[in-house]
Amino acid sequence: MTKKIFITGSTGFVGTNFLNFFKKDYSFTLYTKNENKVITNEDVVLHFAGKAHDLKKVFNVKEYYEVNTDLTKTIFSNFLKSKAKVFIFLSSVKAVKDNDIQNLTEEIIPNP
């Protein structure tokens, strides 16, 4: 039986490449902010959604918080209420730092 996967961030870099690589092997339910789907019959939740880059130089704290914190809490809460057994969350480099001053290591204290 094909595993069913609920995925957020399917239009981002990681999500797009993940789907292209695994689309023949799994069944996907794609979460979009417009449809606001809920986890129902999926076995696995992959939470790839997040805002990491401000390419337009229009930094908006509220938007970063909504996407990176509120959405994560909502998705995880829905996961806990679902039959899914696995939750995988990929975070961004923004959770550690927001500049290129030094190389990233495990010893760096997060400073988002």
Regions found by a protein language model. Give the residues of each.
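Glycine/Thr-rich phosphate-binding loops of Rossmann-like dinucleotide-binding domains
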Residues: 15, 55-56, 97-100
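N-terminal Rossmann NAD(P)H-binding glycine-rich loop of SDR-like oxidoreductase domains
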Residues: 2-24
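Short alpha-helical oligomerization interface
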Residues: 55-71, 104-112
